[in-house]
Amino acid sequence: MKKRYFFTLFLTLTGFINGFAQDQILYKKIDTTQLYLTVYPSVIKESTKKSPAIVFFFGGGWNNGTVKQFEQQALYFSQRGMTCILVDYRVKEKHKATPFESLKDAKSAIRYIRAHANDLQIDPSKIVASGGSAGGHLAAATAIINDYNESTDNTAISCVPDALVLFNPVFDNGPGGYGYERIGEAYKNFSPLHNIKSGAPPTIVFLGDKDHLVPVETAKYYKTIMEKVKSRCDLFVYEGQGHGFFNYKNLEYYKKTVSETDTFLQSIGFLNKDPFVEIK
């Protein structure tokens, strides 16, 4: 793996996965902890046009997880003309972090990406946040939670994404919801379900009806509240599927959710119909 400098102050490691270039960019440092973005640039290069971006947050209950969870989705959407970014963030097992620190990192990542949009060759008005489970919570929370900003962040730069793609997101953290035993009464300012507001970005949600962490009724209620504030929220519920059904190892539903995501992104003007890319 060869080394180069992406910006004067930020070390970038450049490599290849399955023939696709990827960059690792340091976006945040907390004491001795360094957090990186893994960037898959759009393979479609147009000198006068910057690409939309999709930013993926891995799942794992804010406890653990791997930045590689959405690697296959990133490879697909980079071929479709998006710059795809996999975010590493602090978790309990590796960093002794709280969910609140995980959210601070997610917000820092979006701000970094938007601040460096020119360097990354992306359109700062077309940034999609995506994630699964706790990563889905983080993606949603960057859009609608006002609190939990890192003290070193430039809060003049918006951390609000322009669209959301959520895979069985644990977006109810209130009493009876996911993580309440850790979040406690802070859910009032941490739980996306309890903070939906006017201007929330267009959203698509994927869920299995056998999910043991996210009841279908919760997702339906989320959709209802989104529509009450006049924000779009598409919900796809898959029969017989449990938590994590969308991952690449479950190829049938990986393909279905990628296809629906593609259609959604076309509908909001973030993708064109062409070029056709086989989902595999």
For each predicted feature, which ranges?
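Alpha/beta-hydrolase active-site loop
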Residues: 97-118, 259
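Primarily recognizes the serine-hydrolase "nucleophile elbow" in alpha/beta-hydrolase
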Residues: 108-178, 187-188, 192
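Short beta-strand/loop motif that positions the catalytic acidic residue
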Residues: 205-207, 211
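Short amphipathic alpha-helix adjacent to the substrate-entry channel of hydrolases
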Residues: 67-86
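Conserved alpha/beta-hydrolase "acid-adjacent" motif
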Residues: 212-218
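Short beta-strand element of the alpha/beta-hydrolase
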Residues: 49-60
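C-terminal catalytic histidine-bearing segment of alpha/beta-hydrolase fold enzymes
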Residues: 38, 220, 227-280
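N-terminal cap/lid segment of alpha/beta-hydrolase-fold proteins
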Residues: 20-49
